[in-house]
Regions:
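C-terminal, low-complexity/hydrophilic appendages and adjacent surface loops
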Residues: 398-432
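Bacterial Sec-dependent N-terminal signal peptides
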Residues: 1-41
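A long, amphipathic alpha-helix that forms part
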Residues: 216-238, 251-289, 449
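Short, structured active-site-proximal loop/turn typified by the sulfatase FGly-forming signature C/S-X-P-X-R
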Residues: 58-107, 157-159
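Short, solvent-exposed turn/loop segments enriched in Gly/Ser/Thr/Pro and often Arg
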Residues: 80-100, 160-169, 247, 295-297, ...
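His/Asp/Glu-rich, glycine-adjacent segments
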Residues: 104, 109-240, 248-254, 372-377
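Non-catalytic, well-ordered alpha-helical segments in soluble enzyme domains
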Residues: 71, 141-150, 344-379, 429-430, ...
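Secreted, luminal/periplasmic, and some membrane-associated catalytic domains
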Residues: 65, 81-82, 91, 113-134, ...
Length: 467
């Protein structure tokens, strides 16, 4: 039996029919265009982390900025104004790793730039690797750039550049084609044998033609090398998304008065950002790149002479306290080296001795806490929130205004609990300009990048994308 065909010609002969058809076609065209826009991933992601950038300073010097740096980011970008790290204390290494992995040191195991190795009882650098000298092997989870490599069967190109070794390596991830930093001795760019030598030829050529830069122009040196990395490695030239991690610095030196130097740092950083962002867009195309700009949440506070202003202060001696604790535990449980070591604000107990003597770990921790809390300068004592293979059993929180001092190493350690405000800014194609004051945490950056380039979030990341 033949099916009857629908004859729409009579409908098209009417003005109302033609109107409905035109409206229907326009709707289909709009839906198709929107679908295309939503599905196109940027060809290049540039993740810029600025060490010690602060919102209060950023806003204070706003009248001095040019149009294409911070002003453009704040006017054209999607700006999250209230950002913090979901753990404390924070330093450059733990911050950059959190941004890359979308999780905390509890999972990624990068708790700081340096920790005490319980097996050797010696300080260990966060990117130390006995085989390659330095590498990202200490990161215990995948990073967003690692997942990009996995998703593209290794075809995506991934690079990290920074002034410092740890920032370059940690931001680039395990599977990167290269991580590069400035050698403190030679002022030339260098890398690790961990990375494939084929991807390092461009930096050797770059070193050959570029003079060693001044210390106060390090941000410009990093941005210039990053632009050369894009050109020489053809980043963002095809439909496979590439990834470039760049670490800049808003850290203050000691060359002039703090207020004057702070102004100089932010004005200089503004110019560097403006030039770098424009340079990337010229090379890749404005519609083909997504920028992510954030900060480490860390800050160097100048030493304050509280005594001069009659503000309560003092010094807590970690070495003396560790000796006192060992004497106390020896009196309770018998003579022995119950305290193995101490580092920064942490005390390491002798796990083997505790186990051999069949002593309850929770009991010895409780007794230790009770003693330490009676010590002047101690506000609280906590157990380690992380793996005790790389952290102490007891974490001492000093009384506000007090510093922790180790007489053996002649080093002072102080953690300020003051909130350091900083933003997260997304800039690029299909990103709507908006200021959002809802508080967020930095572990949401990685899944947002992952969603934007249509890949999985890092394997320990449980945070939701921001958009």
């Amino acid at each position: 039996m033949k099916k009857n065909k629908l004859d729409i010609q009579p409908l098209l002969n009417t003005s109302l029919g033609r109107f409905y058809l035109a409206a229907l076609l326009a709707t289909f065209n709009m839906l198709d265009t929107n679908a295309q826009n939503l599905n196109v991933a940027p060809r290049l992601v540039v993740n810029i982390t600025i060490d010690q950038l602060r919102t209060d300073y950023l806003e204070h010097f706003a009248p001095l900025y040019k149009q294409d740096g911070f002003r453009r980011l704040l006017s054209e970008g999607r700006v999250y104004e209230a950002v913090e790290y979901p753990f404390s204390p924070v330093d450059r290494a733990s911050a950059i790793t959190c941004i890359a992995t979308g999780t905390t040191p509890h999972y990624n195991k990068i708790i700081a730039q340096q920790w005490l190795n319980r097996k050797t009882l010696r300080p260990e650098y966060c990117v130390y690797d006995k085989h390659d000298i330095v590498s990202p092997k200490n990161i215990a989870t995948s990073t967003v750039s690692d997942e990009l490599k996995v998703s593209t069967n290794g075809r995506a190109l991934v690079f990290g550049l920074a002034q410092s070794q740890d920032a370059a390596i940690l931001s680039a991830g395990h599977a990167a084609d290269g991580a590069f930093w400035i050698d403190d001795r030679t002022s030339a760019w260098t890398t690790s044998t961990y990375y494939p030598s084929t991807a390092n030829s461009w930096i050797r050529a770059y070193n050959a033609v570029n003079n060693r830069g001044r210390k106060d122009l390090l941000n410009d040196i990093v941005s210039d090398a990053a632009l050369n990395c894009i050109t020489d490695n053809a980043l963002g030239r095809d439909d496979i998304t590439d990834y470039l991690a760049v670490t800049l610095s808003a850290r203050l030196g000691n060359t002039m008065g703090q207020r004057q130097e702070m102004e100089h740092v932010y004005i200089s950083l503004d110019a560097t950002l403006g030039s770098f962002i424009s340079g990337v867009e010229q090379k890749v195309g404005k519609d083909n790149v997504m920028f992510v700009i954030t900060a480490t949440g860390d800050t160097d506070e100048p030493e304050t002479d509280y005594k001069k202003y009659k503000i309560p202060t003092g010094t807590f001696y970690i070495n003396r306290t560790a000796q006192l604790l060992n004497m106390y535990l020896s009196a309770v449980y018998g003579s022995g080296a119950w305290v193995e070591s101490y580092f920064k604000n942490q005390i390491f107990l002798n796990h083997k001795l505790i186990e051999d003597n069949k002593i309850s770990y929770s009991e010895i921790i409780l007794r230790s806490k009770d003693l330490l809390k009676m010590t002047a300068g101690v506000a609280d004592v906590k157990t380690s929130p992380y793996d005790t293979e790389i952290t102490g059993d007891l974490w001492i929180e000093a009384t506000p205004g007090w510093s922790i001092f180790n007489e053996d190493t002649n080093t002072s350690y102080q953690v300020r609990t003051v909130f350091v405000p900083f933003p997260v800014i997304f800039l690029g194609s299909n990103i709507k300009a908006e200021h959002i004051d809802i508080p967020i945490t930095t572990e949401r950056i990685a899944p947002t990048i992952a969603k934007s380039i249509h890949i999985r979030a890092p394997n320990a990341c449980s945070a939701k994308p921001l958009f």
